[in-house]
Amino acid sequence: MLKRMRDDIKMVFEQDPAARSTLEVITTYAGLHAVWSHLIAHKLYNQKKYVAARAISQISRFFTGIEIHPGAKIGKRLFIDHGMGVVIGETCTIGDNVTIYQGVTLGGTGKERGKRHPDIGDNVLIAAGAKVLGNIKINSNVNIGANSVVLQSVPSYSTVVGIPGHIVKQDGVRVGKTFDHRHLPDPIYEQIKHLERQLEKTRNGEIQDDYII
């Protein structure tokens, strides 16, 4: 347990340039508190002490803003940066050396029982606001862009962006747009621009029908 905690603290220093001291990390990093609380909750969950496990999970959620179901299986050195709004579902599994930013959801797609949440491999980065949904596999060494919605499994050494998520880089070779948060697809903006073009055509007499969408 102590080795696990030391490894988690080391991961914070490796991933966050704002971390200045061990005391600061231990006392002020909500992501660390959520992960350590989950270790206790998960142990109780495996002992079928479900109420106690959920109670610890809820208390942790209240203080950290991070919701991790006690049934979730989490590997070593998980770093949750900022953390507010992160949700990790019951049947989710997370490998080692994973970094998750605020607003990320690792959730299901419906009310089905059984395995319904994603499996996350090792060395994965999931950027702010991304949603990874359903019983899918995110293999190792994957980057998922901010606000992406991933609904299908992703092979190793890939970069995924967009809604729905699509691969833009695989095995170091670019297959689409670069992994740059400034240039992620914005479906709402694209729809507005489409409507503006349709309205302009209507004004110019190119479209006669009143229904332009």
From Swiss-Prot:
Cellular component terms per the entry's GO annotation: cytoplasm
Chief location category: cytoplasm
Any GO BP annotation: cysteine biosynthetic process from serine
Entry EC number(s): 2.3.1.30
Gene3D superfamilies: Hexapeptide repeat proteins, serine acetyltransferase, domain 1
Catalytic activity field: L-serine + acetyl-CoA = O-acetyl-L-serine + CoA
Pathway: Amino-acid biosynthesis; L-cysteine biosynthesis; L-cysteine from L-serine: step 1/2
Gene Ontology molecular-function annotations: serine O-acetyltransferase activity
Entry keywords, A to Z: Acyltransferase, Amino-acid biosynthesis, Cysteine biosynthesis, Cytoplasm, Repeat, Transferase
Pfam families attached to this UniProt entry: Hexapep
Compartment(s) where it occurs, according to its Swiss-Prot or TrEMBL record: Cytoplasm
Protein family according to the UniProt entry: Belongs to the transferase hexapeptide repeat family.
NCBIfam families referenced in this protein's UniProt entry, alphabetically: cysE, EPS_EpsC
Protein name in UniProt: Serine acetyltransferase
Natural source organism: Staphylococcus aureus (strain Mu50 / ATCC 700699)
